[in-house]
């Protein structure tokens, strides 16, 4: 924002997607359904893993935490977005914006770390099966999960720390459906170079490091699979990785669009669409992806349903 006369404000206005009341009503119904499916799908994954002894393995422990993170990620954004569909503009206190951004960044960053941990788990299972029990022990799993949440919190601290040092001025209208960092910077009358660079370096580092771990894991996995003589063994190894690769491609494909591509190459509306995809749609798709192509999950679900009916 250009320097000059301004009035510091304590709340911001989220403009959402559209001013058209009919479109807002349709979007409200669509995203309410998506949010309901997200909550039910991910909660079902968590309950299924907890209640199925055959799923008490490192792979499914990580998956249960991914499901929990997806619930938190979607819940950080969707309720405010639904509220915005009921009115033209959504008023939110700056403190509320800080809390929402902190939650979004925490869960989003934690998801990156968990996806990397899951790639490492698949690497150990396929490339070093005899060492799996020691290299993916319960202690190692707890450390991986704890480090994932800690990494998410640290990254969120860099964003919220910078945001708390900013002042916001009129016009205090944010052209977005939630308190994302970049749109908030546009209405700040006090931001400097560091408030742009520090969060970018922090989030960029997480993306680069986790993508490197995932890519390296799958290079070794691919080499190991190609060395297998058994066709059945190859198919089994590929099937255990397909769901994870699909989830990784969807998640990193969208956040790369946001954080890597030059801002001038896409519009604010395109930014909103991509943001909806990775904060709202992907958390709904993950439990479907991991359920449809996973024999263990399908079998556990059948057993649980059979036990429930008896």
Curated annotation (Swiss-Prot):
Gene Ontology cellular component terms for the protein in this record: membrane; plasma membrane
Segment forming the signal sequence: none
Sequence ranges on the Extracellular membrane side: 1-25, 76-99, 155-196, 259-271
Keywords tagged on the record: Cell membrane, Disulfide bond, G-protein coupled receptor, Glycoprotein, Membrane, Olfaction, Receptor, Sensory transduction, Transducer, Transmembrane, Transmembrane helix
SUPFAM superfamilies reported in the protein's UniProt record: Family A G protein-coupled receptor-like (SSF81321)
InterPro entries linked: GPCR_Rhodpsn (IPR000276), GPCR_Rhodpsn_7TM (IPR017452), Olfact_rcpt (IPR000725)
Family the entry assigns: Belongs to the G-protein coupled receptor 1 family.
The name this protein goes by in its record: Olfactory receptor 5P80
Upper lineage: Eukaryota, Metazoa, Chordata, Craniata, Vertebrata
Gene name per UniProt: Or5p80
